[in-house]
Amino acid sequence: MKQYLELMQKVLDEGTQKNDRTGTGTLSIFGHQMRFNLQDGFPLVTTKRCHLRSIIHELLWFLQGNTNIAYLHENNVTIWDEWADENGDLGPVYGKQWRAWPTPDGRHIDQITTVLNQLKNDPDSRRIIVSAWNVGELDKMALAPCHAFFQFYVADGKLSCQLYQRSCDVFLGLPFNIASYALLVHMMAQQCDLEVGDFVWTGGDTHLYSNHMDQTHLQLSREPRPLPKLIIKRKPESIFDYRFEDFEIEGYDPHPGIKAPVAI
């Protein structure tokens, strides 16, 4: 995960001071890309411990089309608490858009099922895309999608994915996002009988919050360790039937965790 540390250093060296929606303040750059060959290991940051339980449960929650934090709480995941209303609802965020994008005639489009069918039946298509950026429903969402748009690509029997992330909290959010989409690529590849290829991450407003600077310098002082390996213990009948117990990360030996405040 040397690329991740290089991005942190780039933001420190080249970032512009900007105000932001949260009032915290950031150092920000615009436009950055990283490529991770998933054959080389699972891209889980090793210079601090990442909470893998939260990453896995959040992705399973997205895939169920769920937008209420009750499932997350049942599994001791609190990463969405700050944005939920008194009933635990978040509005039509990621899960809703992925699984039930509304159409003008009252139907709903299941984008995940659609891209799975494309991968199986038309893998050379240039339209294998999922979008969470529904302009017509942004004002109903507790938080507008940060990781907004992703595209799959098949070549030589390998499945790759590129994500466009319009807004990226480099210290807290990005390690989660990289691991989450890498996990999704592994799951989709298994369902389509493909090998994994690359995960390409593309960031728009890529920033470090002003109250994460000490934590960033601490993390930059640490040497990355070898990447772990993801093991999927079974192949469910559907992408929607995976369970938390299906996943095992082998050889994860990170440095200690580093706490930092969330900008809301």
UniProtKB/Swiss-Prot annotation:
InterPro entries in the cross-refs = Thymidate_synth/dCMP_Mease, Thymidate_synth/dCMP_Mease_dom, Thymidate_synth/dCMP_Mease_sf, Thymidylate_synthase, Thymidylate_synthase_AS
Give the molecular function GO annotations: thymidylate synthase activity
UniProt: dUMP binding residues = R21, R126, R127, R166, S167, C168, D169, N177, H207, L208, Y209
Does the record's keyword annotation contain Transferase? yes
Q: How does it assemble?
A: Homodimer.
Q: Where is the active site?
A: C146
Q: Which GO terms describe its cellular component?
A: cytosol
Q: What protein does this entry describe?
A: Thymidylate synthase
Residues recorded as binding (6R)-5,10-methylene-5,6,7,8-tetrahydrofolate, renumbered to this chain, are H51, D169, A263
Q: In which pathway does it act?
A: Pyrimidine metabolism; dTTP biosynthesis
Q: Which UniProt keywords apply?
A: Cytoplasm, Methyltransferase, Nucleotide biosynthesis, Transferase
* Disulphide-bonded residues: none
Q: What does this protein do?
A: Catalyzes the reductive methylation of 2'-deoxyuridine-5'-monophosphate (dUMP) to 2'-deoxythymidine-5'-monophosphate (dTMP) while utilizing 5,10-methylenetetrahydrofolate (mTHF) as the methyl donor and reductant in the reaction, yielding dihydrofolate (DHF) as a by-product. This enzymatic reaction provides an intracellular de novo source of dTMP, an essential precursor for DNA biosynthesis.
Q: Which SUPFAM superfamilies match?
A: Thymidylate synthase/dCMP hydroxymethylase (SSF55831)
Question: Transferase: is it a keyword of this entry?
Answer: yes
The reaction(s) annotated as catalysed by this protein in its Swiss-Prot or TrEMBL entry are:
dUMP + (6R)-5,10-methylene-5,6,7,8-tetrahydrofolate = 7,8-dihydrofolate + dTMP
